[in-house]
């Protein structure tokens, strides 16, 4: 050891200087277990600076949030529109249902409060009971069974189709949904007309059946199925796209039939979507007024659904108080239907 080497070792061992050692107390070992710290170097040597520590994320950093006045400002326009166009008419209709308000006469100028008389009158009216049953039949067969059944069938058959064929069929189905109801009703009146109607022309022989008079309820059911199937098909198509292709391929390889695949794989997977679609279709069909454009509620009240019944007593007879009471009853029925669907959906989620 030279004198210079000894002087450097003594300087490194002086107070304030750490001398790195290896695991055996000797010279530092680069590959040893201990960490090597840089030694202060004299002139002519290169010092190794210690790496700067990375800044730690501040757990208490402020998160950008919208204050309450700003949030209210964003929500206020939507709430205002809902209040003006939905809440106020509903409350006003409920108020009118408790009065004898009419379009003309003394009741129009000075309506009187009659309490629940209008509701009792509606429940005792045989035409109201008949309209309620017609509405439930119309909703069940044209909405739940017809639209959902045909919509799911089309979505299942077209799920693997690609190219212009699928696009053409989808356009044709969706056109029946986006065309205005008045135009569709005019087309169906021409289709079902007894003299020169398209349907009678397609049937062999000299057929002159007045379908809107002979089978009015069946006519509006088929009309509504044709009209609303596209909506159900779009919803079911989106639901089927969520199925993993491997599940269907496994069922195919194992030799499962189409019904077994639907029963054991498809239906359990899209049951939530089916309940949601059933709720939307049911409530939409229950409040539908379009059959009035086909039959006007006739013949002999055979197609008078509740929406047409309210129109007849409210606008036809000018009895706004009674018509508003029937509207409130329809609102309650809609709420009951919605609660039943929500209850079934909640029970399914609990079981799953």
Question: Where in this protein do the model-derived segments appear?
Answer:
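A structural signal for multi-pass alpha-helical bundles of membrane permease subunits
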Residues: 67-352
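Transmembrane alpha-helical segments of polytopic membrane transport and secretion proteins
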Residues: 1-76, 163-167, 342-352
């Amino acid at each position: 050891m030279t004198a210079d080497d000894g002087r450097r070792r003594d300087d490194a061992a002086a107070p304030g200087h750490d001398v790195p050692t290896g695991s055996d107390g000797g010279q530092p070992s680069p590959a040893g277990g201990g960490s090597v710290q840089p030694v202060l170097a004299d002139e002519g040597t290169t010092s190794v600076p210690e790496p700067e520590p990375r800044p730690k994320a501040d757990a208490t950093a402020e998160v950008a949030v919208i204050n309450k006045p700003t949030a209210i400002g964003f929500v206020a326009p939507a709430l205002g529109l809902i209040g003006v166009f939905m809440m106020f008419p509903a409350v006003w209709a409920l108020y009118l249902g408790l009065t004898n308000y009419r379009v003309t006469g003394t009741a129009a100028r000075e309506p009187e409060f009659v309490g629940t008389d209008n509701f009792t009158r509606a429940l005792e009216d045989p035409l109201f009971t008949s309209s309620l049953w017609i509405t439930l039949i119309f909703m069940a067969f044209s909405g739940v069974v017809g639209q959902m059944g045909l919509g799911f069938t089309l979505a299942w058959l077209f799920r693997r189709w690609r190219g212009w064929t699928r696009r053409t069929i989808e356009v044709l189905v969706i056109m029946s949904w986006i065309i205005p109801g008045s135009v569709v009703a005019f087309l169906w009146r021409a289709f079902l007309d007894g003299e020169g109607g398209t349907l009678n022309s397609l049937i062999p022989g000299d057929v002159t059946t007045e379908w809107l008079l002979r089978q009015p309820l069946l006519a509006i059911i088929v009309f509504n199925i044709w009209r609303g199937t596209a909506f159900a098909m779009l919803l079911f198509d989106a639901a089927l796209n969520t199925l993993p292709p491997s599940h269907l391929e496994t069922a195919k390889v194992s030799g499962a039939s189409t019904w077994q695949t639907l029963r054991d794989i498809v239906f359990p997977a899209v049951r939530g979507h089916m309940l949601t679609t059933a709720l939307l279709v049911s409530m939409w069909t229950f409040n539908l007024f379009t059959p009035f454009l086909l039959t006007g509620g006739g013949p002999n009240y055979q197609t008078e659904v509740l929406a047409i019944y309210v129109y007849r007593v409210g606008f036809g007879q000018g009895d706004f108080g009674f018509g508003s009471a029937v509207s409130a009853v329809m609102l309650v029925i809609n709420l009951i239907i919605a609660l039943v669907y929500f209850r079934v959906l909640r029970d399914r989620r609990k079981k799953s």
